[in-house]
Amino acid sequence: TRCSRDWSSDVCSSDLVFTEILQSGMSDEECFIVHRGKECFVIMNAFPYSSGHILVLPYREVSDVEALTPSEHAELFALVTTGIQVLKTEFKPQGINVGINLGAVAGGSVAQHLHVHVVPRWGGDTNFMVTVAMTKILPEALDVTAARVRARWAQMGGAR
């Protein structure tokens, strides 16, 4: 399983994509993991809506918020909060979306592994190109963005 810069569409379309990434044996840098906690981790979205789009999720595959243990729940939302602070500090967005898509009909593309989207937003960042031509225009490469997020996270006290 590859999870490096050329994110395979086969891997990314897998229902087990996050578990496959964790079990790939590749470095966090190659897999765009920016922080590891005790029960949850933070990874860059391979198909970001905007620069800095992160996903926060438990290591354990669960599909619903109510399936989280109390400690997973606490850490997940603590990491969401830290992620918001990291993105605000590093990218200076005008707003942030935080969301969970529970189930395929709700928009969940990896519905069996709960993950929280934390998306920096700016006025006019409609990303209309995605719907027109399946093209993503971002100001920097994903590995550069991941390095920025990782460094800022460590600087803000979230050492790995």
Which residues does each PLM region occupy?
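Divalent metal-coordination and catalytic microenvironments
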Residues: 16, 42, 58, 76, ...
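Short histidine-centered catalytic/ligand-binding loop motif
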Residues: 55-77, 133-138
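Flexible phosphate-binding patches that engage nucleotides and nucleic acids
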Residues: 127-160
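Single conserved hydrophobic/aromatic residue that forms the stacking wall/gate
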Residues: 1-11
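A short glycine-rich, hydrophobically flanked beta-strand micro-motif that places a catalytic Asp/Glu
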Residues: 91-104
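Histidine-centered divalent-metal-coordination microenvironment in nucleic-acid enzymes
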Residues: 53-55, 106-127
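A glycine-rich, hydrophobic loop/mini-helix early in the fold
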Residues: 29-62
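Long, well-ordered alpha-helical scaffolding segments within enzyme catalytic domains
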Residues: 69-93, 143, 148-152
